Amino acid sequence: MARPRKEAPQRNLDRDENARQQPTEEPQDEAPRNQGRQQQQQRPPAAPRRPRRFRPGTVALREIRRIQRSNVPLIPHSPFMRLVRELAAEFLDDCRFAAETFIMLKEVVEDELVNHFGNVQICSIHAKRIIITVKDFKLAKLLKGEPED
């Protein structure tokens, strides 16, 4: 036995067609759209936004990470040369250096400083602090096995 087929309800086509065909009337007192754009351009500029304030220590940690990622020399060349010459003058009377010596010494010193500051930062984070302090330096030195001054 076949089921009787249900037919879709008849829509009132006259009402739907009339709704679609009605023209939309624009009010006559409104200005054209182009004039609105010109008025927007003539407005005075908005006040500049204040820079966003980050929580304390956020910028410091960002700078530490940026410096750790970089591979540019952090110690200026001239002051480093002067310091090495002063230290060498304390031990030797007449001492001369090749140019490569300063480059090699500078790389070794920077590497040692970066490693030491990394250890100091780990000590600071372990103590649940963001700012590194003198006691972090002392703890890092103690953990490294160097005698305390």
UniProtKB/Swiss-Prot annotation:
Chief subcellular location: nucleus
Could you name the domain of life of the organism this protein comes from? Eukaryota
Keyword DNA-binding present in the record's keywords: the answer is: yes
Chain segments carrying region Disordered: 1-58
- Record field: compositional bias (Low complexity): 33-44
Mark out the compositionally biased spans (Basic and acidic residues): 1-19
Tissue specificity is: Pollen specific.
Q: Does the keyword Nucleus apply?
A: yes
Please name the InterPro entries in this protein's record.
Histone-fold (IPR009072), Histone_H2A/H2B/H3 (IPR007125), Histone_H3/CENP-A (IPR000164)
UniProt entry keywords in alphabetical sequence: Chromosome, DNA-binding, Nucleosome core, Nucleus
List the GO terms this entry assigns under cellular component, sorted alphabetically. Answer: nucleosome; nucleus
Gene Ontology molecular-function annotations: DNA binding; protein heterodimerization activity; structural constituent of chromatin
List locations, semicolon-separated.
Nucleus; Chromosome
Quaternary structure, from the entry: The nucleosome is a histone octamer containing two molecules each of H2A, H2B, H3 and H4 assembled in one H3-H4 heterotetramer and two H2A-H2B heterodimers. The octamer wraps approximately 147 bp of DNA.
Q: What's the family?
A: Belongs to the histone H3 family.
The entry's function note states: Core component of nucleosome. Nucleosomes wrap and compact DNA into chromatin, limiting DNA accessibility to the cellular machineries which require DNA as a template. Histones thereby play a central role in transcription regulation, DNA repair, DNA replication and chromosomal stability. DNA accessibility is regulated via a complex set of post-translational modifications of histones, also called histone code, and nucleosome remodeling.
Q: Cite the PANTHER family for this sequence.
A: HISTONE H3-LIKE CENTROMERIC PROTEIN A, HISTONE H3.2
What is the name of the protein in this document?
Histone H3-like 1
